[in-house]
Structure formats: C-alpha cells, structure tokens
Amino acid sequence: IGTRGSKLALWQAYYIEEKLQAAGATAEIIIIETKGDKILDRALSKIGSKGVFTEELEEQLLDGRIDIAVHSAKDLQSDLGDDFEVIAFTEREKINDVLVSRNKELDVHSGEPFVIGTSSTRRIAMLRAYFPHLKVVDMRGNLQTRIRKLDENHCDALLLAYAGVHRMGYHDMIIHE
C-alpha cells in the first residue's frame, strides 16, 4: 500500500490495511514523498503540476513497487487516464469545511476582520466572495504543520476539511461548521 507520510495519510492507509487484513489479505505500508510534500514555500497553484500529491504514487504503481495507493479523493485528478482506476472508496466523512481556531470568539458573520489560512483555491475564492472583510493567507503543510502555524500567529483561524480535523482529533478547535 503506497501512501504519503503525513499523519492523516498514514491514518487512512492503516485503516485500509486493517480492512484488507480482516478480509485475509496481507499488506505493507510504503511511505512515498510527493512533490506537494517537498515544495512547501509556494502556493499549490504556483507549483504548476497536475497531480502534485499523486504523481510519485502513480509512478510506483506503474513500475510495480506498490500494488495500490491510498489517497484522499480531493487530491486526485478528475481524469486518471487509462493506466489507473479507483477500485474502492471508504465510507465518506461529512463533506463540509470547518473553521478551526483557538479563539472561540471569532465569527465570520460579525464583519470584524481577521486572518484565515488555507491553501485551497476553491476555499480562497469562497472566502473572498462571501466574506470580503476577511484576509486570506496561503497556508501550506500537513494538518499538524498548519495547526502549529496557527499557534505561531501566522493566522487567526484555518479553513479545513472536516474529515481531516475529525480523523486527527481536533474537534475541540472547530468554531464554525
């Protein structure tokens, strides 16, 4: 099983490993570092590559070093090409984004300005359209890195996918769903 090395990616891979072993299969986790993991000083939109989190996984699938790759569906390209297919999906978490912060007083509807970190082009566009009083900053890195940056005051809050926040146990930081 090929996967990225973040805590969230490993959580997902170990979850699949348990399911496979329960069905009688043997499995081994192989950690693969991707371009998206290595280049942290630029916005994803500036890296200029499709599959920034999947390309290295795909290479190892093609050359037989791994048999399957476990990955978040949100990072997959919409067209996988002829060489790959999605063979399974796990039960889906809630699909919404959540705002997380240590400051429970923040309110996006208050009209008061504050700084939100995210790396998603979709989330940035949504925030700018619906909450123009907020400042949005690019915030790259895995979930733990983003939480650390929040704690270091790089931003006041983070806009993240509920699934990752839930799986990594950061429920107490959710201030808006």
Name what the model sees in each region:
Residues 1-177:
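Domain-level signature for soluble enzymes in the chorismate/prephenate branch of the shikimate pathway
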